[in-house]
Every structure is written in structure tokens, then in C-alpha cells.
Amino acid sequence: SYVNNQKNNVLNDKPILGVYHVSNQGSSDMYCKGSLMLHTLRNLIDNDELWFSIIKGISNNFKYQIVDGQDIIDYINLVSDKDFSIFFKQYLEFKDIPEFQYSIVKDGMNKTLVYRWEAIDKFDMPLLINIGQEDFWIYPSNSFSELDLGAFDINDFNIRTDLFYINTKKL
């Protein structure tokens, strides 16, 4: 898709947000990386009706006002009824994007997913994975977790990187 092709243009050389109150030249990453961050957020919200009401609500509620990024984050948190503060901190204030680290441990026919986020402290973004025809959410944190996946063909395992702007690393 158009959004995912933008990944090729991101250098991850600087955070999206620059240093305030100084003349700070940002990276061109801010455009593509910002677009990919919003694509990730839309998939985390996982409700297009809510997503588009948030986008329209930002326009309607903040017209004729001077706002900053925190005003927008607070609004998204309020309307979505979820706290995305750590998500925004990771994507806006740090040059590196979260890395999903994982391994699949085989025990006979059964397989166990061992996984975590390599990201800022308390980063706990849910993630969709796919086995065969089925997508399901997992809930990584900064600490390793294990999930029994049962028996399946290892070639059917897929991390939905088309929906999230992340790096992955198989350990």
C-alpha cells in the first residue's frame, strides 16, 4: 500500500519532535514517519468509525484555537478511551521505532512464542500476528512473555507489519 511504501523513505535519524525554543532543523523523516505513526495508531484503535470521528473532532473542536501536540494527544486519549501517551512518546520523541523481538520455541508439534518490545520503558503496544487465516492480538511489554500457540506450520506465522510501523527481530 501507499503508506507502507513510505517505510523505504524513513532514515530514523532524528525524532519527529525537535528541541523546543531553539532553531532546530528537523529531519525529512517527520513526514513519512508521522504518516506511518498515524497508520499504526489507526490500526491500534481498530475501529474506523471511531478513527474518523477523532480526525473530524480534532478539526471541529480545535478550530480557531492555538493548540500543541499535547492537546491533540489528550483529545485522542479522551475520545478513544485509551491512553496512548507512551505510544506517542516512543514515536515522537525517539528516533528509533519499537522493535518486536521474538522466537518460536518448538516442543514436539507444539510451538511457543517468546516475545517482547525493545522500546522505551512501559511501552506495551498490542500487536496483531497471523497464523494461517487467523489474526489475533498479543500484548507485548518490555519483559519477555510466552504464548502457547499449539501445533501449526511455522511458515504460516506472520507478524502484521503491514498494519504497524515497527521493526522485528527473530532471536
Regions found by a protein language model. Give the residues of each.
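Hydrophobic alpha-helical and helix-loop surface patches within well-folded domains
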Residues: S1-E118
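Edge beta-strands of extracellular beta-sandwich domains
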Residues: D162-L171
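Beta-strand-rich binding/interaction modules
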Residues: F84-S85, F100, I104-T161
